[in-house]
Design a protein with these regions (language model features):
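Sec-dependent N-terminal signal peptides
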Residues: 7-14
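Mature extracytoplasmic domains of secretory-pathway proteins
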Residues: 79-140
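N-terminal export/targeting and maturation segments
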Residues: 27-94
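Positively charged n-region of N-terminal signal peptides that target proteins for export
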Residues: 1-4
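C-terminal motif of bacterial Sec signal peptides marking the signal peptidase cleavage site
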Residues: 18-22
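Low-complexity, intrinsically disordered terminal/linker segments enriched in charged
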Residues: 131-205
């Protein structure tokens, strides 16, 4: 699991889902925003197997990082095997970010990257659930495990994962989606040590 400090995010993000640390912020405004979020947000998720991917990332990894007001994954699907529509294999670069909501800005608190392969199966309840997740290793085994897990899709994964601009585009895309489906007014996001960046909430992404 690739954990990233907020300091590292400020130096090297977006490599994209998250860093450990805390944002400088006004505590009173922060608490007010957290309360508002808890009272008003019903997190609406993507449909089908992508909903299960988001849920898994939030539940399994978002909770491991320093908490924020809201957890928003960033998922770049590298490839899928949907031969069996009730048992889908998803290869992806999976990021998780926790944010505090301050004014009109999503302020990054923590997050990390969890690339790998998920098996997502439709249960008796008609909903998809992640049943297995094989994650790329950190450190010495990183390259070998990435090539093994992604197979002939490794080059596609590497091209995305090593491209900061592409990672940032994917992150913004998923932030915009989250804001749209939840009808939230936030217009910017901000990583620690960086100026706030505008979110194009009217985008059709």
């Amino acid at each position: 699991m690739k954990k990233i400090s907020l300091w590292m995010l400020s130096v090297g993000l977006l490599c994209g889902t998250a860093c450990l640390g805390s944002c400088n912020r006004n505590a009173e405004a922060d608490n007010a925003d957290k309360t508002a979020v808890q009272d008003t947000i019903e997190v609406k998720k993507k449909v089908g197997f992508l909903a299960a991917v988001d849920n898994y990332l939030m539940d399994s990894f978002g909770s491991q990082y320093s908490p924020g007001s809201v957890c928003i994954p960033s998922v770049e699907v590298i490839g899928t095997n949907e031969e069996n529509p009730d048992s889908v294999v998803v290869w992806g670069d999976f990021w998780v970010f926790n944010y505090n909501l301050v004014g009109d800005t999503l302020k990054t608190v923590s997050g990390g990257d969890h690339p790998g392969k998920m098996c997502v199966v439709k249960g008796k309840d008609g909903k998809f659930h992640v049943t297995t997740f094989e994650q790329v290793e950190d450190g010495h085994g990183n390259l070998e495990s990435a090539k093994r897990i992604f197979g002939d899709q490794y080059e596609k994964f590497h091209a995305f994962n090593s491209n900061e601009e592409k990672r940032e585009e994917a992150r913004v895309r998923d932030l915009v989606y989250f804001l749209k489906v939840n009808k939230l007014p936030y217009k910017h996001y901000q990583d620690y040590g960086w100026p706030a960046r505008e979110l194009t909430v009217n985008s059709e992404q």
